[in-house]
């Protein structure tokens, strides 16, 4: 069965680019999202997120009649579910969005349909999703019931793209295809090959789920090593960025760069899925998460020390000291604030500090709710002119272009080594 109509459930940072990629190949694409604002924005040919090159692709797809958005699922040949999978307070995965998405498409499923889960998920999630679908559609057969002869094919195919480069990497990167059966994998591969230039690498759904978690846990462990080095170097009076530069001259050493912590919807979340299912075995992965989650507290302590130094060297009162935090996103040059350590740091500073806390984030127009009323969103030049203490949290290009003399004779906490 060919794929004439494709539906993408969840039109966020992954779902919308995926929908746009299919639509750019002149496939009929129906995007589904519960956010009415996002739906209306897309149907105007505009985008509600920041991602280079995405806006033009969406505009052309909508104008060409290949992409439309709605809040209610409709019948399609293939469904791709790209909804959030956060963790709960106890770090157990929260599959509520996936369950809701699956149950929303169940009434419109037809024989021959393909359902792909893209959301980062714990091992076994694809089989669980298939169970939800089967429970709502006893008139259809699914892979866990009928194997290769199932009416509906199901696969797990995780994304592996870098925010800020999504429209390139979505097409160029290899794709892991984890079907519940070989037929499921073959059909999922055929779907992605509509736009994919990379290779479709086939496995089973459980291995594909674990592969995504493994990739991000590997990165988290390596970042934790760099972050722990930064704590040690601060204690020993050593420039950690110089140290890493020198150590990386060893032909078999490649240490990553430290920062204020780890954020985003993948690296800061996915390792907990492994830990939750394997608490006795995943000791290193848990420790890495704890190291990275602890880094923001250390940064706040450095800011408190900088304010104390400022007070000791001037005649200002604490309420007269202005602190400027540079960056809120979880990585450079994007507007995505999910799980951002910079957000938590800015919030902690503003709650502790009796003076004004300025925030500079060039990729947003208004502060998120958790900072509204605590901080002041400021322009770059205004913050540089007004602040006594400068806190570098995200190395956006605009910040890296700041000349050294602009921060001269200020109290600086630089978590990214931009002003070293």
Curated annotation (Swiss-Prot):
Catalytic machinery residues: 212 (proton donor/acceptor), 266 (nucleophile)
UniProt binding sites for UDP-N-acetyl-alpha-D-mannosaminouronate: 160-161, 212, 216, 219, 250, 252, 263, 330-331, 416
GO molecular function: NAD binding; oxidoreductase activity, acting on the CH-CH group of donors, NAD or NADP as acceptor; UDP-N-acetyl-D-mannosamine dehydrogenase activity
Keyword field: NAD, Oxidoreductase
Highest taxon above the source species: Bacteria
InterPro entries: 6-PGluconate_DH-like_C_sf, NAD(P)-bd_dom_sf, UDP-Glc/GDP-Man, UDP-Glc/GDP-Man_DH_C, UDP-Glc/GDP-Man_DH_C_sf, UDP-Glc/GDP-Man_DH_dimer, UDP-Glc/GDP-Man_DH_N, UDP_ManNAc/GlcNAc_DH
NCBIfam families linked: NDP-sugDHase (TIGR03026), PRK11064.1 (NF008286)
Binding partners and assembly: Homodimer.
Family stated for the protein in its record: Belongs to the UDP-glucose/GDP-mannose dehydrogenase family. WecC subfamily.
The protein's name: UDP-N-acetyl-D-mannosamine dehydrogenase
Organism from which the protein derives: Salmonella typhi
Gene name of the record: wecC
